[in-house]
Amino acid sequence: MYKRQLEYPEIREYLDEHIEKDWVDLVYAGKTIVQRGKEANDQINILGDDGVPVEYHERFWKSELIDFVILQQDAFDDIDANCPMERQQMMYKMVLGICNQEFAFADFEACSQFFKGLINLFRQMNYSEWKSEKFEGYRKQIEQYVSEQSK
């Protein structure tokens, strides 16, 4: 889909009806997180890891979470390559929910470690059959992992 197509009322109506009401708003929310993450990364590259507040690192890693979990798929894995829309919706909303939370990190290294661990859990979840025990196990692990770090 071209980036401006989401602005067309007909596209919005179609997505509201066939995917979920206000789906376009959720897409824009994710897009904004990714854009803010790129901006934060630019500042980190200019000023250095210690030259910016931890919040910049958090913003960057939230965008990486969307990138690694939602935007990238493993075409060589049958499960990840063939992801039903219901699963995509659930995963996207789960990732957005995490991105909308506030966390308390001691420093940028703690932030980086947390998000790398989270991305790894989501990747394992992506390789698990939809609604299987393994899938649900990873979902619970992710929820626990996030709740331990939340403010």
Language-model regions: role of each:
Residues 3-151:
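Conserved catalytic/coupling modules of large nucleotide/cofactor-utilizing molecular machines
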